[in-house]
Structure formats: C-alpha cells, structure tokens
C-alpha cells in the first residue's frame, strides 16, 4: 500500500478562496470587513516568518490587518494594555498574540486577557472549555485545520482508535478533544507514556506533534492508518522534515500529510475562518 498525500496546501487555498468571496460579498452589501490584530513581541526569526504569513493572508483576503511589533523588552503590563485597546476596538474581530513570548511575560495571563469572542487562536480557557463540553465556537487553529484534512479523506471517524502524540495546550490537548467529538476512541501520549510503540501500532489514526524530526518510525504505522504529521523541523542540511519518518510511513498508511504542505497551511486557513466567524457571529450587531 502506498499512502495518498493529503494536500493541505490545496485544501487551504480552497478555504481562502471561499473566505475571499464572502469578504467581497460583505463589501458589496455595505458591511465592514473582518479585522485581525497581530501582536509580535521580540524578534524570534520563526515567529517573524509565521506572523508575516498571517499578515499577508489577511491582506490577500481583504481583511483589515493591524500589526503591532513590540520590542522584546516590552513589559507585561504594556502588552496587556495593548490587548485591552484591541478588545475595545470595534474594527478588530480577532486578536492574535504570537507565541512563544519572552520569559518575563506570563503566557496564560496574556491569553486570558483577550476577550473570548476575539480569541481567534482558540486558546482562551472559555473556548477550550466550550470544545470540552461539545459546543465549540472559536476552535484552536491547528486541530481545527487537521479535522478539515481528516474530513477530506472521506473516512468515517466514528469508532476509530486515534492516538495523539504530544500533549501541548496548542495542539495535543485540543486535538484529543476534537477527535473525541468526532467519535474516536482517543489516547493522548506524552513524555511519560509507556509502550508508545504498542499504542501507535494499534492506531487507525495518528496525530504527531512533538517537534522532533523522525520521532515516530514509519514501521510503527498500522497498515491503512491515517497519519497527520504536525511537526516541521529544519535539518542542518536545510531540509524540512516532520515528526514521522515519511517514506516508510507512506508505505503503510492509507493517507498521510506531507511536510511541508500538509498541516501548516491549514493553521492559517483556520485562523482566517475563525476571524470571519467572530465578525459574523459576535460583532456584526456591534
């Protein structure tokens, strides 16, 4: 068996085209366009690349994009004050603070300062809680994008044994909740998990998000499984690779996401979907 690649780039582009059409229709109807505030603290090169991609995507779709590039020495209070301003700005539907933040700033305090109806990253405890209670509104972008990729395969997720490798607040934990909502029997694995190989070998669906190149050997993948590789790691050679050993995994799996061009584009597409959703559902009556 040779796996079929799940083309995240093409699926994300289709979503962006639909969103652009909706924004155009809003303009023609005399409605305002969605607005996204993107806040970057410091000059982390990877963060600068991600933020640049998000800003360009906003402009391409006709969203308002507000950029705030703050020095790494910016105080926590100053950042919280800026978030307060964006919370009150009626032209802003979504607020994104690029993570990670400098060590002197407490991430949880920053995330909780963003109004839940403007939390387009889906990290606020309110929005994570809504997902846990099976009534999601603004969902975490990467898991949301992954669910779209899984749906694109046409495979019925109800009753599948799913394994999520990685338990971060950004991907692993909300991913497990999404899969539970989709009817999977879900196991979350982390650094203390025993017999990881045994768990992965039994999985019909594997999502890996640990940030370690080739962490999951391709031989572990069950024949016919769906493999979602969230990792994006740059080797010394400059090559980008995922957390799963792709070539061997692709021999066993039925569907697999490539790196790059799999999960990455979907994260930004989901962010844009969330921003339009916040505009339409929460703020059109403001």
UniProtKB/Swiss-Prot annotation:
Q: Which UniProt keywords apply?
A: Amino-acid biosynthesis, Histidine biosynthesis, Hydrolase, Methionine biosynthesis, Multifunctional enzyme, NADP, One-carbon metabolism, Oxidoreductase, Purine biosynthesis
Q: Which CDD domains match?
A: NAD_bind_m-THF_DH_Cyclohyd
- Pathway(s) this gene product operates in, as recorded in its UniProt entry: One-carbon metabolism; tetrahydrofolate interconversion
Q: Which Pfam families match?
A: THF_DHG_CYH (PF00763), THF_DHG_CYH_C (PF02882)
Q: Does the keyword Protein biosynthesis apply?
A: no
GO cellular component terms, alphabetically, are:
cytosol
| Gene Ontology BP terms | L-histidine biosynthetic process; methionine biosynthetic process; purine nucleotide biosynthetic process; tetrahydrofolate interconversion
Keyword field contains ATP-binding = no
User: Any idea of its EC number?
Assistant: 1.5.1.5, 3.5.4.9
Q: Which reaction does it catalyse?
A: (6R)-5,10-methylene-5,6,7,8-tetrahydrofolate + NADP(+) = (6R)-5,10-methenyltetrahydrofolate + NADPH; (6R)-5,10-methenyltetrahydrofolate + H2O = (6R)-10-formyltetrahydrofolate + H(+)
Tell me which family the UniProt entry assigns to this protein.
Belongs to the tetrahydrofolate dehydrogenase/cyclohydrolase family.
How would you summarize the oligomeric state and partners of this protein? Homodimer.
Function noted in UniProt: Catalyzes the oxidation of 5,10-methylenetetrahydrofolate to 5,10-methenyltetrahydrofolate and then the hydrolysis of 5,10-methenyltetrahydrofolate to 10-formyltetrahydrofolate.
HAMAP family referenced in this protein's UniProt entry, alphabetically: THF_DHG_CYH
Q: What is this protein called?
A: Bifunctional protein FolD
Gene transcribed to yield this protein:
folD
